[in-house]
Amino acid sequence: MTQVRLSYAYGTSNQPLLGMTIGEKFDQACQQYADQDALVSVHQNVRLTYKQLQQQVNAFACSLLKLGFKKGDRLAIWSPNCVEWTITQFAAFKAGVILVNLNPAYKSNELEFVLNKVSCKGLVIASQFKSTNYQDILTKIAPELCQADNKVLNAKRLPHLKHVIKIDDQAHTGMHRFQDLLTAPT
């Protein structure tokens, strides 16, 4: 007979739990280290201080709420590591949205399964990963994206997905530009 082991050890500790959310702890760190580097992305040639990162996170969180995201809604991100990933992660925490991290190597059937399985309301996508074009894959699953003039998706195969946010400098039919959502008033 095998012995059952706990996946987490727990008990009393000298280190108390913090009575704050991740978003609150983030804001505390931003206030304490405002002018210090918070995020450096060498491959994107981007360097943000805590204050700059906080401004972008707050703007993106506000934009998510303006798009109709509510506490407990799911927002997926399908992208390799980048600055936008970090902004999305902290903005989701602050807006009360559950972030769903997708494997950047997913193919169409895997993407469709996961987005439906967890009822994702939104999807943040990069342009591509290696030789995989994310927009092409998404358009094959949800051809309605090309007709979503008001940027609210109603796709037969992805019924829960309403918003696609593209990490890109160009405007795309049916998609929000990530950069545009960083300029929202906080």
Name every feature range the model reports, one short phrase each.
Residues 26, 88, 138:
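Aromatic/hydrophobic pocket-lining residues that form π-stacking "cages" and hydrophobic walls in ligand
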Residues 18, 35-82, 86-90, 107-112, ...:
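Conserved AMP-binding/adenylate-forming core of the ANL superfamily
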Residues 95-180:
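Structural core segment of the AMP-binding/adenylate-forming
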Residues 2, 25-49, 170-173:
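AMP-dependent adenylate-forming
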Residues 1-20:
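Flexible, non-catalytic linker and terminal segments flanking ANL/adenylate-forming cores
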